[in-house]
UniProtKB/Swiss-Prot annotation:
GO terms for biological process: translation. One of its GO terms (cellular component) is cytosolic large ribosomal subunit. GO terms for molecular function: structural constituent of ribosome. The keyword Phosphoprotein does not apply. Keywords: Ribonucleoprotein, Ribosomal protein. Signal peptide: none annotated. Belongs to the universal ribosomal protein uL30 family. The lineage of its organism: Bacteria, Bacillati, Bacillota, Bacilli, Lactobacillales. This is Large ribosomal subunit protein uL30. The keyword Ribonucleoprotein applies. Part of the 50S ribosomal subunit.
């Protein structure tokens, strides 16, 4: 089973409200903040909405 390491690399300033909500829901705050989330369809869907703001790596448990 793999997890996803998600890092916010661009600011959410001047972004759409929906994109800001997705960033907050994933647990990201400031630039360079990193979280580990499970690799599932819901997480992947959220990441697609903010793909231009983040970097994603797969990590093994």
């Amino acid at each position: 089973m793999t997890d996803l390491k998600i890092t916010l690399i661009r600011s959410v300033a001047h972004r759409l409200p929906e994109q800001r909500k997705v960033v907050k829901a994933l647990g990201l705050g400031k630039i360079n903040s990193t979280v580990v989330q499970p690799d599932n369809a819901a997480t992947r869907g959220a990441l697609m909405k903010i793909a231009h703001l983040i970097s994603v790596e797969e990590v093994n448990k």
